[in-house]
UniProtKB/Swiss-Prot annotation:
Substrate binds at R52, G53, A54, R89, Q188, N239, K240. GO terms for biological process: L-methionine salvage from methylthioadenosine. This is Methylthioribose-1-phosphate isomerase. Keywords: Amino-acid biosynthesis, Isomerase, Methionine biosynthesis. It comes from Anaeromyxobacter sp. (strain K). PANTHER family: METHYLTHIORIBOSE-1-PHOSPHATE ISOMERASE. The gene is mtnA. It catalyses: 5-(methylsulfanyl)-alpha-D-ribose 1-phosphate = 5-(methylsulfanyl)-D-ribulose 1-phosphate. Gene3D superfamilies: translation initiation factor eif-2b, domain 1, Translation initiation factor eif-2b, domain 2. Pfam families: IF-2B.
Length: 339
């Protein structure tokens, strides 16, 4: 089956030195693009989830620094911009990785800085396509695949990680379909994953977040495929809040639980998931929906944006360098030493 060419949510306008971001807060109602000309504006867009997904925000940050360099920012301004971008979201390691990589080039001519940002983008899309190729054979024939949040083209430079596996499986002729859970409170599954898959002609059915266990018990789910925001050296995985619960359910029902992520998401300097900083977002994102309050005034709410899935619950981690199974720590170390 031929699948529609995926969107690329982060673009660079060379003629005008602008970062163009697909406003993911406006989806699915409107396909709206924002044009940003400063690192401050891009950092704000990362913080408020205009652009989201660990690889995508890394690409956005790289282009933000390229904009600053091309517009003549001096060393002090570039250092401040890099620091601001790196701190925009603490859990997603791709962001800090991209900023570190760009920072090493900030003393070079502006054209070289932009070339490095383009390289980060191109490498991420190539990694996603390789992840898809390695992950597709893991998906059972004609399976209904459960995914969480959005780890598709919208979350990357293009093609996707978890949805890259789905996309590659479909392109190979495997007649699979997808269950996308809505992913409260930002509704990435409902607004983004369902929109992206429907746009690309891949069968998708939307679920509420509490349905997965029952559908697993009924034999309606063949495997779970998710992305990641950070993978610790021991194989623990930080991903969108709710991922851990799905991993527990999958283990109980003896279903494969796969994590798809580029190597830039692997953080060998972080020993375990307990060492990963978890971003806490504002309570308003939980108690408000589409501008309307959905909980009584005065009732507090919590929103840890991510949780950590222990490596013991992960069947395999799929990166562009290879597929890692238990023991995950040894497998990740082997892939690291092979390059």
């Amino acid at each position: 089956m031929t699948v529609r060419e995926p969107l690329r949510p982060v673009l660079y306008d060379d003629a005008r030195d602008l970062v163009r971001l697909l406003d993911q807060k406006a989806l699915p109602a409107e396909e709206r693009w924002l044009e940003l000309s400063t690192a401050d504006a891009v950092a704000a867009a990362i913080r408020d989830l205009t652009v989201r997904g660990a690889p995508a925000i890394g690409v956005a940050a790289a282009y933000a620094l390229a904009v600053e360099a091309r517009r003549g920012a001096g060393p002090e301004r570039l250092r401040a911009a890099a620091d601001l971008l790196a701190r925009a979201r603490p859990t997603a390691v791709n962001l800090a990785w991209a900023v570190r990589r760009m920072s090493a080039r900030l003393g070079a001519p502006a054209a070289d800085v932009l070339a490095e940002a383009h390289a980060i983008r191109d490498e991420d899309e190539a990694a996603c396509r390789r992840i898809g190729a390695l992950g597709a054979p893991l998906v059972p024939a004609r399976a209904r695949v459960l995914t969480h949040c959005n780890a598709g083209a919208l979350a990357t430079a293009g093609y996707g990680t978890a949805l890259g596996v789905v996309r590659a499986a479909v392109e190979s002729g495997n007649a699979i379909s997808v269950f996308a859970d809505e992913t409260r409170p930002f509704l990435q599954g409902a607004r983004l994953t369902a929109w992206e898959l429907h746009r690309d002609g891949i069968p998708v059915t939307l679920l509420t977040d509490g349905m997965a266990g029952w559908l697993m018990a009924r034999g309606e789910i063949g495997c779970v495929v998710v992305g990641a925001d950070r993978i610790a050296a021991n194989g623990d995985v930080a991903n969108k809040i709710g991922t851990y619960a799905l991993a527990v359910l999958a283990a109980h029902h003896r279903l494969p639980f796969y994590v798809a992520a580029p190597w830039s998401t692997v953080d060998l300097a972080t020993p375990t998931g307990a060492d990963i900083p978890i971003e806490e977002r504002g309570a308003d994102e939980v108690v408000m929906l589409a501008g309307q309050r959905i909980a009584p005034a005065g009732v507090p709410a919590r929103y840890p944006a991510f949780d950590v899935t222990p490596a013991a619950l992960v069947t395999a981690i799929v990166t562009e360098r290879g597929v890692v199974r238990a023991p995950h720590a040894a497998g990740l170390a082997t892939l690291a030493s092979a390059r």
